[in-house]
């Protein structure tokens, strides 16, 4: 079966938790599209282009992974990409309710699109982009939570943002 999956997110920035789920999805599906959302309701530190570039760098070793920026409804993006599966990560029980609602909405909008939930490796279960940015903003070392290129880009971004 030729299964194309989409792993959508803001990835601001991509963390080791994201990378772990991407690697595992790449083993499960023939082709994985990392859909990086423009998402106007969030105010990302990195531009869409920067996020696409960082995710490309982190996933360059995965031959069946493609990185694409998008805006608009996820179900429309999935149709454009001819994907039949959405991959979502669940870090904790607290993520489940939101993801459950989202999966049901996506199913209502696109009945043929299945949601598959993956849980992170234990060492990544607490990592979020928000926490990584917060640690970096206060001068903490984020190298254990993100790829080295992401840590460098984040440090440069925060240095530019300081008054």
Swiss-Prot record:
This is Phosphopantetheine adenylyltransferase. It catalyses: (R)-4'-phosphopantetheine + ATP + H(+) = 3'-dephospho-CoA + diphosphate. The record marks 18 as: Transition state stabilizer. Pathway: Cofactor biosynthesis; coenzyme A biosynthesis; CoA from (R)-pantothenate: step 4/5. It is found in: Cytoplasm. GO terms for biological process: coenzyme A biosynthetic process. Belongs to the bacterial CoaD family. ATP binds at residues 10-11, 18, 89-91, 99, 124-130. Substrate binds at residues 10, 42, 74, 88. The lineage of its organism: Bacteria, Pseudomonadati, Pseudomonadota, Gammaproteobacteria, Alteromonadales. GO terms for cellular component: cytoplasm. Its EC number is 2.7.7.3. Its cofactor is Mg(2+). It is an enzyme of class 2 (transferase). GO terms for molecular function: ATP binding; pantetheine-phosphate adenylyltransferase activity. The keyword Transcription regulation does not apply.
